[in-house]
């Protein structure tokens, strides 16, 4: 295929790297306190390297853009975060979009909003106008790092606060859709903005603490406290948010979508939410099979994505790859097939948003 843009779709790449790195950490019980402190520092530094380092373009994956969809329009819209950073976003829409609705799309970790152009375009094609932005420390936005797992909720709160204060958006019905890191914020945003009408969360983790339980389990459990302390220090205002508590007290129409074989946001998150919210008539669940961390993709796309991940890990071992070599690498994959969307899942998403 002809490459005319730089596309990225590996949203959870750094989560995967963290999980792999964690398994390489020595798990022998240190013989003395000094060694224990050294190991703990290695773990925290490794975590910082994965989760507190800017997410910029690696030039080894693709990003779709609005230019790849005939008639799709975009308008730049930036806002200031409470941390003082400029967060860059864009309004996406086709002609004759629904004037009284706005859907905010919240991206996952490891890239920016353009990793989700297929999802954004589908929402626009259905008649919605979509606002999508890059989080702190990601792609086009400012910030030295993404500042940990709770930062997505901080940024989404700033985003909605800005939109509500802008007369250009006065009176709009606001909904939110997010994936993974962005689904965590989506799950919790109604606690901060109860007027949000609809949310769709794809593979959202319940809380920062529950996500750490996933990464630092078994022999690694002893390192969890130090990493949680880092997360709390990085974002004390939003660290403790829990999706069960946020949704238990909310009236927002919620659709929570997961895949039973997700190795990043594991089935336990679905189970906790389903049990904790079983009496909430406004909260609905969808559990897919064989979809990994992308339940809105087709099963074939998920398989291709997995094959790409393995190939990319191998390619990453090549030292000092040139731009030409990177271009040839990404040109060897069919990115449309790798990002194919499951129409059945999207039918349920649209039915939910259209209520």
List PLM regions with ranges.
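Alpha/beta-hydrolase active-site loop
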Residues: 146-167
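Hydrolase active-site cap/lid region
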Residues: 188-236
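C-terminal catalytic histidine-bearing segment of alpha/beta-hydrolase fold enzymes
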Residues: 281-355
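Conserved alpha/beta-hydrolase
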Residues: 123-142
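The serine-hydrolase catalytic nucleophile loop
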Residues: 109-121, 268
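Short beta-strand/loop motif that positions the catalytic acidic residue
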Residues: 250, 256-258, 262
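An N-terminal hydrophobic leader/cap segment in hydrolases
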Residues: 26-80, 88-90, 312-326
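Short alpha-helix in the alpha/beta-hydrolase fold that links the catalytic acid
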Residues: 252, 266-276, 300
């Amino acid at each position: 295929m002809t490459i005319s843009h730089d596309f990225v779709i590996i949203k959870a790449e750094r989560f995967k790297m963290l999980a792999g790195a964690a398994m390489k950490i020595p798990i022998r019980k240190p013989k003395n306190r000094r060694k224990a402190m050294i190991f703990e520092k290695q773990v925290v530094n490794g975590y910082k390297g994965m989760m507190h380092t800017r997410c910029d373009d690696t030039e080894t994956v693709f990003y779709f853009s609005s230019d790849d969809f005939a008639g799709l329009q975009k308008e730049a819209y930036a806002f200031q975060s409470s941390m003082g950073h400029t967060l860059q976003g864009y309004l996406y829409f086709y002609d004759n979009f629904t004037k009284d609705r706005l859907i905010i799309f919240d991206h996952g970790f490891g890239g920016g909003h353009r990793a989700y152009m297929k999802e954004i375009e589908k929402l626009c094609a259905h008649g919605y106008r979509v606002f999508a932005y890059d989080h702190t420390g990601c792609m086009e936005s400012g910030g030295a790092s993404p500042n940990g797992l709770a930062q997505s909720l901080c940024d989404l709160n700033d985003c909605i606060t800005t939109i509500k204060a802008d007369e250009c958006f006065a009176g709009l019905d606001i909904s939110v859709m997010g994936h993974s890191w962005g689904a965590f914020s989506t799950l919790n945003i109604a606690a901060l903005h109860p007027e949000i009408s609809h949310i769709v969360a794809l593979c959202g983790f319940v809380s920062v603490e529950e996500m750490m339980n996933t990464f630092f389990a078994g022999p690694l459990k002893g390192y969890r406290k130090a990493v949680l302390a880092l997360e709390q220090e990085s974002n004390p205002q939003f660290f403790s948010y829990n999706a069960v508590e946020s949704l238990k007290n909310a009236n927002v129409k919620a659709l929570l979508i997961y895949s039973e074989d997700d190795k990043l946001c594991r089935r336990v998150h679905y189970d906790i939410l389903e049990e904790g919210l079983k009496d909430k008539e406004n909260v609905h669940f969808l559990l897919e099979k064989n979809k990994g961390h992308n339940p809105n993709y087709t099963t074939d796309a998920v398989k291709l994505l997995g094959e790409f991940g393995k190939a990319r890990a191998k390619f990453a071992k090549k030292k000092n790859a040139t731009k030409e070599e990177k271009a040839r690498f990404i040109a060897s994959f069919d990115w449309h097939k790798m990002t194919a969307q499951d129409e059945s899942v999207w039918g349920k998403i649209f039915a939910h948003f259209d209520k």
